[in-house]
Amino acid sequence: MHLLLHGIDNARIEHGDALRSPHLVERGRLMRFDIVVGQLPFGRDEWRRDAAESDRFNRFWRGVPPKDRGDYAFISHMIETAVEARGRVGVIVPHGVLFRSGAEGRIRTQLIEDNLLDLVLGLPPSLLHHTPIPTAVLVFDKSRPRRPQPCTGDTPHATRASGGVLFIDASEDFEYGSPRNQLTEEQLSRIVRTYHNYQHVDRFARVVTAQELINNDCNLSIARYIDAHEHQSDVDPATLERDIATLETELARVRREMAQCLTALSDHTQR
């Protein structure tokens, strides 16, 4: 439907279950693509885990997700349909995908250790038509080096080459709307520019080393790595006391004036 609405009518469209029986297959193998994009089917609790354990395309070799959580099954499918050494994957996910443990945590760890994860982008709430919850975008890039070089004194900051992952927190950078919020062109440009530069931006973006992610059990919760809130600077106690004394003096003056006004008003009404 989205393709037709945007005037793209030369696409091959297949209707079916991509996990149980993918249709984009040639000569018994999954078709591969340079760009794979999608949005997880939120709220799908049952995805036929039993079929995945005997998957003929071996898409779940990093691990099989739990039967009541198919998110990483779709992510694994998308990654396996991206061209080796150059394919990229972009997927919209609920935040639980970033931090749930168990089988999902093990798959997430494997993706990080394979140096595939390129971006974790936090989006505002109520951005999508069908859900008010905040979501995130994960980008995987198969062109990243399989054996990243650790950060050294010459390159102290994390990069793609050293296995770094860019985190962007755009969850509070949006325009309120009804029934859904929106990202303006300026806000979108800021996200794209930050991703292109792949550098730290105060309270907005940070490149996190793979080792830090591993130390945090590969938890990708954005708030762990970016503090988007502006902190108050240290306050001098003596200055604070003077300010309070000044305000109290001003408050006493205002109260006296109010009492005088009320007295005058009372005298006037009694005449």
Spell out what each predicted region is:
Residues 1-23:
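SAM-dependent nucleic-acid methyltransferase catalytic core
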Residues 15, 20-22, 27-271:
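A conserved structural/catalytic subdomain of Rossmann-like adenosyl-cofactor enzymes
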